[in-house]
């Protein structure tokens, strides 16, 4: 049986943690930044964890993660 393919878009966006979760970059930090406060932009720089309801979908996209 051939190898399963990883979703390349997902492999660039998600990293698996030691406990089995996935971390990812937060959105809303690419453009239209002038109306956002410095505090909001600073907090958006932090990594966030994928919600537990979505972990199963990410696991399917990354079979070897």
From Swiss-Prot:
GO terms for molecular function: structural constituent of ribosome. One of its GO terms (biological process) is translation. One of its GO terms (cellular component) is cytosolic large ribosomal subunit. Residues 1-26 are annotated as: Disordered. Keywords: Ribonucleoprotein, Ribosomal protein. Transmembrane segments: none annotated. It comes from the Bacteria. The keyword Ribosomal protein applies. The keyword Cytoplasm does not apply. Belongs to the bacterial ribosomal protein bL35 family. NCBIfam families: rpmI_bact. This is Large ribosomal subunit protein bL35. It comes from Idiomarina loihiensis (strain ATCC BAA-735 / DSM 15497 / L2-TR). The gene is rpmI.
């Amino acid at each position: 049986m051939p190898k399963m393919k990883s979703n390349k878009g997902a492999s660039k966006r998600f990293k698996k943690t030691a406990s089995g979760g996935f971390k990812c970059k937060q959105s809303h930090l690419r453009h239209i930044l002038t109306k956002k406060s410095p505090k909001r932009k600073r907090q958006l720089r932090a990594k966030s964890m994928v919600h537990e309801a979505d972990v199963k979908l990410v696991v399917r996209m990354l079979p070897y993660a």
